[in-house]
């Protein structure tokens, strides 16, 4: 008996587990989950009057940041935001400065004299090594060490206005713009332009300024920018714990330069270093406390005069009216030595640094002089002109080295510029006339950290212009919000159509649904309705803003990179939302926040911790299952639609009028016709087989016409009286064996064959059913036995419950009676107190 009870209990537990322990896939829409993205960003700015930012969105500084309780990886170098910034700034720079593109080589031999620089010019005039704003040499442009530009006077012959005659030209050039053959025998040399292998300007080009442009990047709807808010972030952090989400970045500076970064937006009251995760490339943000600035100036003593080579063609040379022009120069202001010392101290504390801790053995050094000019010299742009500054005096000053020290450096303006983003050269117009000056705040240093074998460290200035924008935006990363999530639950989809309930409208920001990113999955799931509506409302709002901008500036879309980016951002957002809704619709979950399905969960060992796990962590664990889950959901939805279609067809018979609809019976009529055609075809096959078998035995076909017809099956009839015209002799013996006509005989033959066929089918079905009965009889007995066990177990459980109820009832009754008696005695005792007092008083008085 105990074995039966154990079997019954095991059966009940197994059934309950199969019913209640099965998990089904549940689709959640609006979960705070994201993945890395690489789509174009668009810009927003306050100053939309400049040429490069006229198509940006108007910036109102209303970009809130939502703190997220998550951990995320950040890398300033492997970053789509910084890569887009580098590409876009280069395109704006290239288009704004406008290098001339109509170029023709001009390689003529010129006879040039030696340098016109006098001995007085080569010796530095006396004066202080350090200058300030009140020093008189600033206005006179004759500070100690500055000199005139090296010039050469050249003559060359070219065809002039008269094409059949040569004309001699005499021009003055910068000595750095010509290459001469080494010949010490005479004072005159054979020289060529140093860009003879490149090109020179043959037509007039417009001269443009490089406008100071500041803008911020914004993500399209459906995408978010995450920022690492950790103060110890150094450009590469696999586990940043202080993450905030925003739709736009901070303002970024676009001025390109080498060695130093100007007017950056990341300067703080501290020095910090962004270090590449795999090599020694760094970008150092300087402490703004030291007020580091640079003031560049070109004296007003140059005049550019074009040379007319032939009719309709002009060559813009460096035609110098003043044969001894002063150099351009840049002056550094601020506490540079203290700032550089703080850089060394910050480097020593950096976790990536492996060199010496002695700051006296850490030096700022310049790159090799045989490098490109942009590498060997500090290169920057001042009012559209490209300055190349020799930083030797500056390095001697900040390092207090032996040699000439100044807080200013000489510079030179060039026309042939190596491109900083792509391999190539651009040729620009000569400098404009008049004095040029520009002042910038120095906010960063581009450098490589080189640790030597003799326990010394060199901070070598670098020409990686792209590092400036990695410092500006390196703490951001672009992610795509994927609001669709899967999780196992015990609820199974109910197949009837769900009713739609009206909900109140919640006005939240676009990033409102991300506020639950760090919360547990269970808590986040409670707000999915509001989150999904917030997501959609934010997409629509940003779409409208983008559309307004595109409409206002549709005539200028061809001018900058922003026009196409605005259009692409709008299209991307619409495509993303439609793609999400298409996926939900393919699973039967369109416009639902929580959608239960009939698909079983594929991995019972993989279940979420609803109270301790975030949706982002859960998505990382099940990412490898998403493809299979999506396919299973689609198959389940297809099967569901088929079932609903068949059910709707059956429901059509509920209406009595549909029974008289001929279209409802056409299918069954077709089935009947097909059955008749099948029987006829089967009979034809049987007849052909029998005919062939009889031909093999020597019989003729039964349908042979007389007199070839031979009666095979005789139908005997009774004897008849002969006619009066006939005699008995005429009748003969044929009267007793008269046969039916052959068509009737053939019909009888077919009937007998059909009866034989039906009999055989009946016998076969009877044998099959009998064998099936014999096979299923043991199963029936086994099921009957198990049913008896189950019935006995149910009766036993019922009796146990009845006994338990009876005992409980008796116990409660007895307890109630006892309690009632106790309460009665207590009540009677309380009521007897006055009587006892009276009796006691009477006894005392007696």
From Swiss-Prot:
Span list, region V1: 112-153
Signal peptide: 1-21
Domain of life from the UniProt record: Viruses
PTM statement from Swiss-Prot or TrEMBL: Specific enzymatic cleavages in vivo yield mature proteins. Envelope glycoproteins are synthesized as an inactive precursor that is heavily N-glycosylated and processed likely by host cell furin in the Golgi to yield the mature SU and TM proteins. The cleavage site between SU and TM requires the minimal sequence [KR]-X-[KR]-R. Palmitoylation of the transmembrane protein and of Env polyprotein (prior to its proteolytic cleavage) is essential for their association with host cell membrane lipid rafts. Palmitoylation is therefore required for envelope trafficking to classical lipid rafts, but not for viral replication.
Name used for this protein in its record: Envelope glycoprotein gp160
Region (Fusion peptide): 504-524
Cysteine pairs bridged by disulfides in the record: 43-56, 100-205, 107-196, 112-154, 218-248, 228-240, 296-330, 382-438, 389-411
One family name in Pfam for this protein: GP120
Region (V3): 296-329
Gene this chain is encoded by: env
Ranges of the Cytoplasmic topological domain: 693-846
Region (MPER), start-end ranges: 649-670
Ranges per topology, Extracellular: 22-671
Region V4: start-end pairs: 389-411
Other facts: Some HIV-2 isolates have been described that can infect cells independently of CD4, using CXCR4 as primary receptor. These isolates may have an exposed coreceptor binding site.
Glycosylated sites: 36, 69, 113, 132, 142, 157, 184, 197, 229, 232, 239, 263, 269, 280, 291, 301, 357, 363, 390, 400, 455, 458, 603, 612, 628
UniProt site positions, description: Cleavage: 503-504
Positions of region (Immunosuppression): 567-583
């Amino acid at each position: 008996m105990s074995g039966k009870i154990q079997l019954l209990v095991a059966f009940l537990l197994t059934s309950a587990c199969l019913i209640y322990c099965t998990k089904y896939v549940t689709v959640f829409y609006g979960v705070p989950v994201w993945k890395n993205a690489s789509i174009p960003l668009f810009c927003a700015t306050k100053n939309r009057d400049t040429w490069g930012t006229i198509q940006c969105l108007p910036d109102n500084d209303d970009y809130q940041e939502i703190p997220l309780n998550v951990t995320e990886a950040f890398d300033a170098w492997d970053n789509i935001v910084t890569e887009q910034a580098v590409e876009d700034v280069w395109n704006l720079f290239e288009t704004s400065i406008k290098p001339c593109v109509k170029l023709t080589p001009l390689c003529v031999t010129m006879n040039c004299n030696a340098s016109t620089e006098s001995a007085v010019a080569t010796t530095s005039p006396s004066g202080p090594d350090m200058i300030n704003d009140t020093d008189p040499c600033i206005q006179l442009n004759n500070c100690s060490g500055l000199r005139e530009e090296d010039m050469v006077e050249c003559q060359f012959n070219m065809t002039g206005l008269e094409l059949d005659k040569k004309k001699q030209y005499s021009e003055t050039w910068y000595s750095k713009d010509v290459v001469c053959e080494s010949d010490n025998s005479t004072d005159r040399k054979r020289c060529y332009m140093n860009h003879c292998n490149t090109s020179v300007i043959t037509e007039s080009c417009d001269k443009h300024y490089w406008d100071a442009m500041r803008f911020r990047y914004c993500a399209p709807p459906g995408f978010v920018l995450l920022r690492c808010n950790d103060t110890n972030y150094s450009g590469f952090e696999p586990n940043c714990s202080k993450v905030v989400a925003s739709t736009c970045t901070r303002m970024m500076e676009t001025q390109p330069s080498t060695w130093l970064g100007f007017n950056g937006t990341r300067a703080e009251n501290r020095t910090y270093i962004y270090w590449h995760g795999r090599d020694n490339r760094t970008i150092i943000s300087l402490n703004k406390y030291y007020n580091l600035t640079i003031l560049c100036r070109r004296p007003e003593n140059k005049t550019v005069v074009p040379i007319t080579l032939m009719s309709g063609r002009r060559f813009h040379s460096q035609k110098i009216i003043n044969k001894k022009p002063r150099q351009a120069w840049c002056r550094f202001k601020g506490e540079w030595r203290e700032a550089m010392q703080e850089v060394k101290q910050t480097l020593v504390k950096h976790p990536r640094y492996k060199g010496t801790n002695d700051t006296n053995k850490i030096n700022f050094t310049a790159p090799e002089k045989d490098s490109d000019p942009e590498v060997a010299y500090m290169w920057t742009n001042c009012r559209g002109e490209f300055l190349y500054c020799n930083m030797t005096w500056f390095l001697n000053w900040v390092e207090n080295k032996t040699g000439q020290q100044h807080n200013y450096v000489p510079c030179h303006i060039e026309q042939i510029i190596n491109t900083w983003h792509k391999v190539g050269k651009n040729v620009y117009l000569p400098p404009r006339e008049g004095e040029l000056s520009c002042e910038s705040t120095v906010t960063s240093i581009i450098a490589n950290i080189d640790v030597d074998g003799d326990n010394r460290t060199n901070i070598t200035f670098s020409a990686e212009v792209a590092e400036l924008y990695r410092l500006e935006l390196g703490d951001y990363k672009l992610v795509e919000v994927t609001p669709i999530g899967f999780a196992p639950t015990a609820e199974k989809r109910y197949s009837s159509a769900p009713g739609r309930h009206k909900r109140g409208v919640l006005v939240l920001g676009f990033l409102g649904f991300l506020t639950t990113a760090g919360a547990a999955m269970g808590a986040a799931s409670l707000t999915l309705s509001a989150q999904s509506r917030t997501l959609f409302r934010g997409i629509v709002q940003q779409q409208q803003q983008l559309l307004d901008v595109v409409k206002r500036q549709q005539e200028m879309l061809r001018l900058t990179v922003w026009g196409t980016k605005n259009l692409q951002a709008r299209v991307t957002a619409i495509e993303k939302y439609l793609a999400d809704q298409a996926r939900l619709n393919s699973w039967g979950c369109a416009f639902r926040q929580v959608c239960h399905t009939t698909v079983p969960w594929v991995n019972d060992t993989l279940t979420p911790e609803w109270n301790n796990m975030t949706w982002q962590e859960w998505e990382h664990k099940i990412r490898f299952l998403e493809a299979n889950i999506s396919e299973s959901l689609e198959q389940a939805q297809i099967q569901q639609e088929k079932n609903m279609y068949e059910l709707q067809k059956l429901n059509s018979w509920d209406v009595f009028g549909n029974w008289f609809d001929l279209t409802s019976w056409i299918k069954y009529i077709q089935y009947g016709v097909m059955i008749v055609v099948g029987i006829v075809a089967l009979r034809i096959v049987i007849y052909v087989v029998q005919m062939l078998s009889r031909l093999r035995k020597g019989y003729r076909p039964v349908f042979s016409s007389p007199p070839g017809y031979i009666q095979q099956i005789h139908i005997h009839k009774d004897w008849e009286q002969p006619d009066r015209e006939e005699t008995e002799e005429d009748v003969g013996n044929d009267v007793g064996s008269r046969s039916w006509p052959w068509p009737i005989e053939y019909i009888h033959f077919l009937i007998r064959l059909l009866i034989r066929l039906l009999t055989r089918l009946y016998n076969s079905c009877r044998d099959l059913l009998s064998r099936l009965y014999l096979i299923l009889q043991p199963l029936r007995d086994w099921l009957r036995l198990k049913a008896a066990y189950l019935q006995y177990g149910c009766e036993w459980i019922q009796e146990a419950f009845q006994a338990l109820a009876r005992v409980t009832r008796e116990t409660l009754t007895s307890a109630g009676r006892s309690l009632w008696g106790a309460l009665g005695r207590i009540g009677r005792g309380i009521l007897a107190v006055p009587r006892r007092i009276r009796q006691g008083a009477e006894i005392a008085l007696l």
